[in-house]
């Protein structure tokens, strides 16, 4: 690594070298421990230190900071690229507080996600944080369209999706899929959310989020 770049990084920054000259910088600390040296478990149950993010393009922007309760109190709200420092679990909870009738009900979103993670563990036997990360990686789109105007006429043009927007869309679609499943349905939203995450992690076509990703990439492919 360039010595000048190394001096600018914080002490908690993790750098992974995929190949000579190809490095991935993960600025969100993952080696935080309790005062007695034991790992900090999410919801008091799940260890995030062993979670693997398979997509190198998302690794720098997907924060897996060990926290008992993922709640940053909006401290990164007005910072440039502050979303990258918000734990991905908290961002999922924030999406569950939509639409407006659920605004501010973070404890409700916390209980929904906590119960959904318990269901995922019972159904798969795996760390639900790893299953959720795999689901986000699978759902994140790589290509979309934008409008370019030439001579007063708008043309759709295919463009690559930035990593921050990829995460935004993936989390939003997973939350939308859970809400759509539980609407006018006796199944609770916790079960619907768990099933949506499991289906997305397994690349199951039954996943609402995967269908949205495929639709976006299909439209983008026709606009190349």
Swiss-Prot record:
GO terms for molecular function: rRNA binding; structural constituent of ribosome. InterPro entries: Ribosomal_uS7, Ribosomal_uS7_arc, Ribosomal_uS7_CS, Ribosomal_uS7_dom, Ribosomal_uS7_dom_sf, Ribosomal_uS7_euk/arc. Disulfide bonds: none annotated. Keywords: Ribonucleoprotein, Ribosomal protein, RNA-binding, rRNA-binding. It comes from the Archaea. SUPFAM superfamilies: Ribosomal protein S7 (SSF47973). One of its GO terms (biological process) is translation. It holds the Pfam family Ribosomal_S7. GO terms for cellular component: small ribosomal subunit. One of the primary rRNA binding proteins, it binds directly to 16S rRNA where it nucleates assembly of the head domain of the 30S subunit. Is located at the subunit interface close to the decoding center. Part of the 30S ribosomal subunit. Belongs to the universal ribosomal protein uS7 family. This is Small ribosomal subunit protein uS7. It comes from Caldivirga maquilingensis (strain ATCC 700844 / DSM 13496 / JCM 10307 / IC-167).
